[in-house]
């Protein structure tokens, strides 16, 4: 196990990180120096990280995150050092990193941190809430704390709120995606949609998030689990983890009618993972009366969903966003 970091030698600790200097650019591997670790922060030596579509999306966006920045938000590793106010983690603990939150707003107090009133500041801006950064690069400060972690590096400065201790470190390098993609898909089904054993659910888009949703629906023993995607390989994997029906979206002339044919009157709930507004509309239209459509896809700011309001009103349908499950 790693030796704890000497609090008086922060300037000696360096990390290798994939740094993005401008929107649409390529990552540059650079050596960063840790400037400080605050009393309420945790330093994690990363073992592995997943790559989420959100990371790729933010690479091309000139807004939200100033540069240079370290992205990544599906990290897993071991606690290397802790600040004096950290209560629940110790050096050597295996952890999976997830999103951050303020910890004290109305949503956080209600144990709904993914709807934190200050979510953007704690996750998208890639800096501490006070605007500072812990890492120094060759040409100046480098933004970190993307989703509270910036895991495209060998070390991560995070908070104990978003460093989840694991009971076992077996295959820890495989656990990173649990902190975002898998919890988003599975959590949307387990915590929000909650299909009953007599009900039907449709998952639009079965990449990692959608497959996690299918697995959760399987665990809840939903009667019908319909997966919709454009790739045969994904649909085949969806079958392997519990989908009872699959639809190849680009080969089905009327997806909504096909779903209603399978389910009888429409799905009880649906989940869109694609952020495609045409697909999201289908996810709403395929519902039976009083059905619920949840969406988790990261749509661009300003995206507009065009739906038949009369259909939603008369059908008593619900359409809601879901963040991090």
Where are these regions (language model features)?
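Glycine-rich Rossmann-fold phosphate-binding loop(s) that bind the pyrophosphate
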Residues: 205-208, 298
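Glycine-rich phosphate-binding loop and adjacent beta-alpha segment
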Residues: 277-325
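Residues located in well-ordered beta-strands
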Residues: 16-18, 28, 33, 45, ...
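NAD(P)H dinucleotide-binding glycine-rich loop of Rossmann-like/cofactor-binding domains
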Residues: 106-204
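Adenosine-nucleotide cofactor-binding segment
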Residues: 200-206, 215-282
